[in-house]
Amino acid sequence: IFGNNDKEAKEQVKQMISKNVDIQVVDLYNLARMENEIDFIILTSDIIMQDKFISKAGTNLILLWAKDHHIPVLVLSDSRKILNTKILPTSIIDSFVKEAPKSKSDIWKGAPEEVTITNYHLEEVKNEEINFFILEQQAYPPNELSQVVDKILVSKFI
């Protein structure tokens, strides 16, 4: 599941195909239609932290649907996206994590002024909602990921 501009997800799909993995791409609007054909869902992340990650808006809706239908969810990413929130000041973390609202006209051009429009492209997701995080060398359940985040970043800063 990815949007039209999700270049990273499209590249990951190409890599998985090169490893003979069968992939079927479904947009968010057709997810329920494909329920009986989905073995698992693979998502991307923009940032991975100890207890949450940043992903595309709509990810929490996908997770609710997947949980209700007993479909495992994986996050495919790499260690360059890890941000250790324990060793950085809040101001630096906020510069990576906080997102300014996007253009209201992306949702409704010429909307009446009385209408409040909220448009964000990213959202925070709790790591505990994911079955496995797949990094370059290994897959980690959420309860192990926090330790991995600490080790990877400490070694990068030394």
What is the meaning of each model-derived region?
Residues 4-158:
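Conserved phosphate- and dinucleotide-binding cores of soluble alpha/beta proteins
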